[in-house]
Amino acid sequence: MSRKYFGTDGIRGRANGLITPELAMKVGQAAGLVFQRGEYRHRVVIGKDTRLSGYMIEYALVAGFTSVGMDVLLLGPMPTPAVAMLTKSMRADLGVMISASHNLFEDNGIKMFGPRGFKLSDAVEKQIEQLLDENLDKKLAQSTGLGRARRIDGVHDRYIEFAKRTLPRELSLDGLRVVVDCANGAAYRVVPEALWELGADVVPISVEPDGFNINKECGSTAPEALCRKVREMRADIGIALDGDADRVIIVDERGHVVDGDQLLAVIAESWKEDGRLTKPGIVATVMSNLGLERFLEGQELSLVRTPVGDRYVLEQMLKQGYNLGGEQSGHIILSDYATTGDGFVSALQVLAVVQKLGRPVSEVCHKFEPLPQILKNYRYRSGKPLDRAEVKSAITAGEKRLNGHGRLLVRSSGTEPVIRVMGEGDDRILVEDVVDTIVSALGGPAAA
């Protein structure tokens, strides 16, 4: 469908640009109207990350929801997967997370979960979008039917206990020194505490949010500081989350990064051995490395590919009955435990494998040699660059050059005005030349 407000992961944009108090209040009203069914009191849970604009958006959403008669339960800073879990646990009609995930503080967003903790379907988002463009004044609640709002205490402990229960009761992290980078984001309290309770020697970094430093030179999209800290502290493992903790990457004891593809391989192999895979395969996106696919073939496991976006991964998992899926970026979905990507719970599954095998992370987590993969971004101001004839011609020529030797993927980002050009294959020089040719046709140079 054509989307005016919703992208691949909710509504996202510059705070006080696209994401204004007026829009947030309207989203609260529209979503509240869509999710009010029956005569009982309806309620929504709202969590957020640590961006400065979170306060503004939170209060605007509260105004919107209460104005249509919904009660609001405010969770404060909490990981996105915790909000999804608590939506279901607290029997809410709707869950809302205020976050722009891995983006810097200037951006913010609104993503929503239904009563079972799953992200909203395209059809429901379309209903909300239609209401956003209507005058809703006549649909507001009467003065006696307005909603109430209150803050909920103790929610951090609920998530910590949930995360711990995903591990066997007898498993301890005793003897492991773990450096955890919380990206100055939503997980800054809960994840270090949970690791400590599991027995790890915890070294937390990027756990001092100030409203401006979320994802700034830290977290899963900027792991350099974590790599240095792991080497400095002679730690066994590093864990890097993003601002809302729905994605994770690992750093081994040598300071080398382990991406989402490798983590999927680790968990898939372990779960196959333990008989925990519901089907002989996993789900990943078109961005996952061909090396992962070849590794899985060696394990007699299949790889189902989807468009980019964890919502599409989950959609196929539910449709085809898989219980493991994810993205190269570190969104890992473990449907036995969660309804969305959970960076911390995914990290715990990897830690469980490390403890079970008693071997260094560098031996456990590098399962395959990734094929050379080149990804370049082209940022544009307006128009539809992919519709231009010279761009289409360059893409067609590139596909012919890589035919049988690799893959080419050119797509528009679902969250920002960027064209992503990805090529991979056995010949790095060939792949890079193909990608550079397409970026030049787009109008290069590539954005950082």
UniProtKB/Swiss-Prot annotation:
InterPro entries according to UniProt: A-D-PHexomutase_a/b/a-I (IPR005844), A-D-PHexomutase_a/b/a-I/II/III (IPR016055), A-D-PHexomutase_a/b/a-II (IPR005845), A-D-PHexomutase_a/b/a-III (IPR005846), A-D-PHexomutase_C (IPR005843), A-D-PHexomutase_C_sf (IPR036900), Alpha-D-phosphohexomutase_SF (IPR005841), GlmM_bact (IPR006352)
Binding sites annotated in the UniProt record for Mg(2+): 101, 242, 244, 246
Organism: Nitrobacter hamburgensis (strain DSM 10229 / NCIMB 13809 / X14)
Keyword Magnesium annotated: yes
Cofactor note: Binds 1 Mg(2+) ion per subunit.
CDD domains: GlmM
In-chain residues carrying the UniProt-annotated modification Phosphoserine: 101
Name under which the protein is recorded: Phosphoglucosamine mutase
GO BP annotations, alphabetical order: carbohydrate metabolic process; peptidoglycan biosynthetic process; UDP-N-acetylglucosamine biosynthetic process
Function: Catalyzes the conversion of glucosamine-6-phosphate to glucosamine-1-phosphate.
Active site: 101 (phosphoserine intermediate)
E.C. number: 5.4.2.10
Cited PANTHER family: PHOSPHOGLUCOMUTASE (ALPHA-D-GLUCOSE-1,6-BISPHOSPHATE-DEPENDENT) (PTHR42946:SF1), PHOSPHOHEXOSE MUTASE (PTHR42946)
Keyword presence, 4Fe-4S: no
Keywords: Isomerase, Magnesium, Metal-binding, Phosphoprotein
